[in-house]
C-alpha cells in the first residue's frame, strides 16, 4: 500500500507540495509525487482516488482550500474571475494516463472556487457512475458534481 499526504497549511507553495510515498516492500517508502504528477502545491485538505472513467485505473481528486482566504466575498469572486488565480486554488482533478497523473480540472468541469473541507465519492444518483460531493466552507456553496458518463461532471 502506498501513502498520499495532502499538505495544506500556511507555507509557501514549494513547502506545501503534496507527498506520494511509494511502498518499496522492504519496510521503506520513496517519495515520488513529482514523478507521478501528483505534487499539487495548493492548500490541500483531502484526496480521493477512484476510477471516474471506468478504464480500470485510479484517477484522483485533490480537494483544496482557497489561497484567497480572508477576502470579503465580492473581492474573492472578482479575484477568481481570473482563470490563473482560480486554477491555483480550485480543487484539482487528475486523470491517470499510463501511470502519470494529468491535471484535467477544467476539462471535467471542476474549475470552480473551492474552500473544501469535506470530500465524498459515491454514486449519488444510482446510475453506476461515481459522483463527487465537496463540502465547502465560508461563502462558497457546496458542490455536487454528477457524472455525465462522458468524462465530465455537472455541478447541480
Residue ranges of each PLM-predicted region?
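Acidic, glycine/proline-rich Ca2+-coordinating loop motifs
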Residues: 1-156
